[in-house]
Regions:
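Active-site ExK catalytic segment of metal-dependent nucleases
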Residues: 1, 120, 168-172
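N-terminal extension/subdomain marker
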Residues: 1-111
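A general secondary-structure signal for short beta-strands and their flanking turns/coil
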Residues: 7, 114, 162-164
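Conserved beta-strand termini and adjacent loop/short-helix elements that scaffold enzyme active sites
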Residues: 13-17, 122, 172-174
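A short acidic, often aromatic-flanked loop/helix-cap motif at beta-alpha or helix-coil junctions
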Residues: 17-24, 127-128, 176-178
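Alpha-helical structural motif
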Residues: 97, 115, 178-179
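Active-site-adjacent "gating/activation" loops or surface patches in catalytic cores
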Residues: 102-137
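Catalytic or ion-translocation cores adjacent to nucleophile or general acid/base/metal-coordination motifs
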Residues: 132-180
Length: 180
């Protein structure tokens, strides 16, 4: 590469791929939701549901602490299995936008909701908050299909430094492959 493209800044990485890894890649590609656990989501008492005949969604906000815990207790390959792009990291040369997300979270967490576009997640199902606990949404399975940069940046902040930020999120249930 260096002799044919001397001006190009190209880095080549190699990984050993065996049957287990190939099978894992196949499973991730054939099912967009690869994280099958169930989670309780603190919604701070806010949210609403939208339904059509083909899908339903619950729109709410999650705390940065909840998102931080989700990222750090799951496998990114599974968490982002339905997303064509994984978390890209942050730094001056890597990704200035993610660096900006991190700085906003640290400097002005209470305004983060206004700065951030939010997250879209596919789930197998959810149970809306009821009168016994208006602050909890129960979800089954999850893959983040939009918001990997926000999720990864929040997850990369050191424990105890996440702050009181809230992040917009949509939890969508849809089995129609022409829509998802």
């Amino acid at each position: 590469l260096e002799s044919n493209f001397p001006q190009a800044d190209v880095q080549v990485e190699a990984i050993e791929v065996g049957n287990n890894r190939i099978e894992s890649w196949f499973n991730l590609s054939s099912n967009p939701i690869s994280l099958n656990e169930e989670f309780d989501v603190d919604t701070n008492g806010h949210g609403f549901e939208i339904q059509t005949k083909n899908w339903k969604a619950y729109v709410t906000a999650v705390s940065a602490r909840w998102l931080h815990k989700l990222y750090n207790t799951t496998t990114p390959d599974l968490l982002f299995s339905g997303n064509p792009r994984d978390y890209l990291g942050y730094g001056k040369k890597k990704n200035k936008i993610n660096l900006g997300i991190r700085d906003s979270l640290k400097s002005d967490p209470t305004s983060f909701w206004a700065y951030n576009n939010g997250i879209t997640a596919l789930v197998y199902d959810y149970a809306t908050p009821d009168n016994t606990d208006v602050n909890k949404l129960h979800i089954k399975g999850i893959t983040i299909i939009n918001g990997a940069q926000t999720t990864g940046t929040v997850g990369s902040i050191k424990d105890g430094q996440v702050g009181d930020a809230w992040i917009p999120i949509r939890f969508i249930v849809c089995t129609d492959s022409t829509i998802i």
